[in-house]
A protein has these predicted regions:
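Active-site lumenal/periplasmic loops and adjacent helix-entry segments of GT-C-fold
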Residues: 91-226, 230-234, 463-477, 484
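Transmembrane catalytic cores of multi-pass membrane glycosyltransferases
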Residues: 106-111, 137, 270-384, 391
Length: 506
C-alpha cells in the first residue's frame, strides 16, 4: 500500500499535467459506464450519487500502475519541465477564459439542457420515467450513451450549484483545460522542439477559423458546453496521444488502458463517439502495421482480410444496407438528399477559402516534421489513409448511407485538423530557429498567424459567426429557454431555471 501511495504522489507532483489528463479520462470512462448501468436498471440520479464520490479516487488510483521513468532527471531537464508546466498552465487559463467569455448560443441546447434539467429536477425519480429519457431502450439510445448532460446534472446535485453554472461554466472550463493538455502532450510527442509554437498556432486556429458553422474551431472553446465538441477537441486527439504513447513497451499496458478509457469517454460525451472513436482507432491500427516485420504468411493473411473486408463493405454500400440510416438520405447543406460529394462536405466543414486550403496543406506536410522515425511511419500512414479517403469520390456517401446520416461530414472528425496543422507550423518554425535565429522564426510565425487570422472577416470571434464577448454566464439569449423534452419554456430568474410544474428553480 505504501508503494502505491508513493507512486501516486510522485506522479501527481512530478508530472501534474499528465496525471490530470490521465485521471480525467479514467474518471469520465467510469462515469459513462455507471451512467449506462443506471439508465439500463432504471435507477435515479440520487441513487448513484454515492458512487459518484468514489470515481475520482478510483481514477487517481490508476496512476499507481504507471511505470517509473528510468534514471534521474538532470537539473536542466527539471527546470525545463517546470517551465513547460508553467507554459501549459498559462495556456489552460487562456482557454478557460475563451470558453467562459465567448458567447455563441446553439439551438441543440433546447434538447440537451432540457434533459439535464429533467434529471436534476427529478433526482429521486427513476431515470426512464423522466422527460427526454422515457420510452424504449432502442428509441432512446442517445439517452443511454450520452453521459455529459447527466454529469452536469450530477455536479449540480452534489454541489448545490444552479444547473446553468455547471452546464455553461464549470464543466466547459474543465473540458477546455483537458483539450489544452491533450493538445500539448500530442504536439510534444510529434514535434518536441516546436510544441509551444504549435500550441500558439492551435489557439490562432481555434479563434480565427470560423469560415463556416461546422469548422472544428466552432466545435472548440466556443462550444465546450456540448459533448460533440469535447469529442472532436479532446477525445479524438487523446486517442492519438495514448496510441502513440503505447508504443513504449515499458508503458504499453498503462497507455493501452488509457486508449480504452478515451474510447469509452468518447461514447459518453457524444453518441458520435460510438463510430468516430473506433474508426480513429482502426485507422491508427492499420497505419501502424509494419509489413517488414511480418512474415510472408501473416502478410498474405492480412492482404486477403483487407480484400474481403473491402469487398463486403462495397457490397453493403451497393446493396443499400445501413446500420442506422434506413432512409438512405445524406445530410448536406442542401438538406437531406440522396447523395453528396467529398468536395461538398469539405466546403461544409472547412469552408472554401484560403484557410481551408492552408490547413489541409499543413496537415499533408506535417509528417515531415515528426522527429521520431517509428512514430513518423505510423503517422504518415494515417495521413495517407485520410487523404486517400478524401480522394475517393463516394467516401462521404458511403459513411452516411451505410452507417449514419450525419457521418456524411462527421467522418472527417477522425483527423483533428487544428492539431495536425499545428505540427507543421510548430515544426517549421523550430527548424528555422535552428538554422537561423529566434527573431526570424518569430517573424515567420507572426506572418503566418496574422495572415491566417486576416484571411476572412468571418472568424470564430466575430459577428458574422454569431459570436460575442460577454461576462461568463449561460450561453442563451433572452430570459427563457425552450425545453424540447418538456414541450414548454423555462424562465431564467436569478441564475436558475424555473419550469411550470416545479416549485423551485434549479
Amino acid at each position: 500500500m505504501r508503494g502505491i501511495i508513493k507512486n501516486i504522489r510522485e506522479q501527481l507532483f512530478i508530472h501534474p499535467v499528465e496525471s490530470f489528463c490521465d485521471t480525467f479520462f479514467v474518471f469520465h470512462a467510469l462515469w459513462t459506464l455507471i451512467w449506462i448501468l443506471a439508465y439500463s436498471t432504471n435507477l435515479s440520479l440520487s441513487a448513484i450519487s454515492p458512487i459518484f464520490f468514489l470515481l475520482i479516487p478510483l481514477a487517481v488510483l490508476t496512476l499507481a500502475f504507471k511505470g517509473q521513468a528510468t534514471g534521474q532527471p538532470t537539473p536542466s531537464a527539471t527546470r525545463r519541465a517546470r517551465r513547460d508546466t508553467l507554459s501549459v498552465l498559462m495556456l489552460v487559463a487562456g482557454a478557460i477564459l475563451l470558453t467562459l467569455f465567448l458567447h455563441r448560443p446553439d439551438a441543440d441546447d433546447e434538447q440537451y439542457l432540457g434533459m439535464a434539467f429533467s434529471l436534476l429536477a427529478n433526482a429521486d425519480q427513476p431515470i426512464q420515467q423522466l422527460p427526454g429519457y422515457d420510452g424504449t431502450l432502442y428509441a432512446n439510445a442517445f439517452s443511454v450513451i450520452s453521459a455529459y448532460e447527466p454529469l452536469k446534472a450530477m455536479v449540480s446535485y452534489v454541489t448545490g450549484l444552479p444547473l446553468l453554472a455547471s452546464y455553461y461554466v464549470l464543466l466547459p472550463a474543465l473540458m477546455s483545460a483537458v483539450t489544452v493538455v491533450v493538445t500539448y502532450r500530442l504536439l510534444r510527442e510529434l514535434v518536441p522542439e516546436g510544441w509551444l509554437v504549435g500550441m500558439l498556432f492551435f489557439f490562432v486556429v481555434m479563434i480565427a477559423w470560423g469560415d463556416v458553422h461546422r469548422t472544428l474551431a466552432n466545435f472548440g472553446f466556443v462550444r465546450m458546453f456540448q459533448g460533440k465538441s469535447v469529442l472532436v477537441s479532446a477525445v479524438v486527439p487523446a486517442i492519438f496521444l495514448y496510441w502513440y504513447l503505447a508504443r513504449d513497451k515499458g508503458q504499453a499496458g498503462y497507455h493501452s488502458f488509457l486508449v480504452s478509457a478515451a474510447l469509452v469517454t468518447g461514447v459518453g460525451v457524444s453518441r458520435g463517439g460510438l463510430i468516430i472513436g473506433p474508426l480513429v482507432l482502426a485507422f491508427l491500427g492499420l497505419a501502424s502495421i509494419n509489413f517488414r516485420s511480418l512474415g510472408k504468411g501473416a502478410t498474405a493473411i492480412l492482404v486477403v482480410t483487407v480484400i474481403i473486408a473491402s469487398t463486403l463493405l462495397v457490397f453493403a454500400y451497393r446493396s443499400g444496407w445501413s446500420l442506422m440510416n434506413p432512409s438512405q438520405l445524406v445530410y448536406t447543406p442542401r438538406g437531406d438528399v440522396s447523395s453528396t460529394t467529398n468536395l461538398e462536405m469539405l466546403e461544409f466543414t472547412m469552408g472554401s477559402g484560403a484557410r481551408a486550403i492552408f490547413l489541409l496543406m499543413c496537415v499533408a506536410a506535417s509528417f515531415l516534421f515528426v522527429e521520431d522515425k517509428r512514430l513518423r511511419y505510423s503517422y504518415q500512414n494515417f495521413l495517407a489513409i485520410f487523404f486517400l479517403l478524401l480522394l475517393i469520390p463516394w467516401t462521404s456517401n458511403f459513411f452516411a448511407k451505410t452507417f449514419q446520416q450525419y457521418l456524411s461530414w462527421r467522418w472527417m472528425w477522425v483527423a483533428p485538423i487544428p492539431v495536425l496543422a499545428s505540427v507543421t507550423v510548430g515544426g517549421a518554425v523550430a527548424s528555422i530557429r535552428q538554422v537561423s535565429n529566434s527573431a526570424l522564426a518569430l517573424g515567420v510565425f507572426l506572418v503566418i498567424a496574422v495572415a491566417f487570422a486576416a484571411a476572412s472577416p468571418r472568424r470564430v470571434l466575430s459577428q458574422e459567426n454569431y459570436t460575442s464577448v460577454r461576462w461568463p454566464d449561460a450561453k442563451l439569449d433572452g430570459d427563457s429557454v425552450y425545453f424540447r423534452p418538456h414541450n414548454k419554456a423555462a424562465a431564467i430568474k436569478n441564475g436558475k431555471l424555473h419550469l411550470e410544474g416545479y416549485e423551485k428553480g434549479f
